[in-house]
Amino acid sequence: MAKDNRKLIVVGVDGSELSLVALRTARRLADLLHCRVEAMTVWTHPISLAAPVASAEWSPRVDAEEALNEAVLQAFGDDVPEGLTKIAVSGQPVQVLVEASKDAEMLVVGSRGRGGFAGLLLGSVSSAAAAHAHCPVLIVHPSETE
């Protein structure tokens, strides 16, 4: 399989409605700019005071990959963009997205994710990513048309 040398648009995906809008927006931009899309989700090891769960029973990485697959399915159905890659990375969302931005033409994120306060105009991850990314950042806000 030949390597895809098109420039990259990275999309932060957390399964929220705005991250689905971010995926769709990135696709439209990728089509216009002849780029490829990388859908990225970030997971962390849970902090627990209880005994660790055996990895054969539960894996946060597998959960993250399944959630990412579901988000891509919800965003595109059977019409997944050609060359779209999906990646689930362990770490802190801001750090992972900023690192990914080093190789990207653009980073696309929703204005708010699953956490935090619904009334805020801009979430902590999108705000920090915009402040520290190594490429332009597009922050997708809710609209009545989506």
Which residue stretches match the model-derived regions?
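Structural beta-alpha unit
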Residues: 1-5, 18, 32, 74-107, ...
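Short, hinge-like loop/turn segments at secondary-structure boundaries
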Residues: 54-58, 104-105
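A short acidic, glycine-rich active-site loop
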Residues: 56-67
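Glycine-rich, Arg-bearing micro-motifs that act as flexible, cationic patches
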Residues: 106-132, 142, 146
